[in-house]
């Protein structure tokens, strides 16, 4: 599906969402590595910092509501697969919303499999897949960037538990503590770039 086609499909669904006639969620997985995330550092002298090994990972499969910015998550410490997506679908179905639900998600194989599509059909949830290589069209990518900035950059956590708690706490407060900061970031506008020649010297 081309970008022009997906935008034509998204536009009426956004209009319904803003009118309260539909719930549109953007879905994506983020893999937070328990390692060093430096901000900006430059100096003549060598500088040693405390840093975790980077061998542990906190996986978050999230669904971000396009209007309220509520985040529904499924988390684990192994990997995200089709069963994780099915768990998320069941969580969304359990919300008991009185309007149709549309999920906007990328073309990851585990999100397009027969199991996921069967569960979505059973729950009456529409799956709207984005074209390949178009993270700019996935609203939730902006949230992941915000979470990394808030919780990871230039931060050191003594243990993995504190690391995961910081991420969960940030996601829990998208509608409260972080509401003002996210207000301008999570707006329903998208960037797309035409093909352009790269200039080299």
What are the language-model segments listed below?
Residues 1-201:
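Short functional hotspots at interaction and active-site rims
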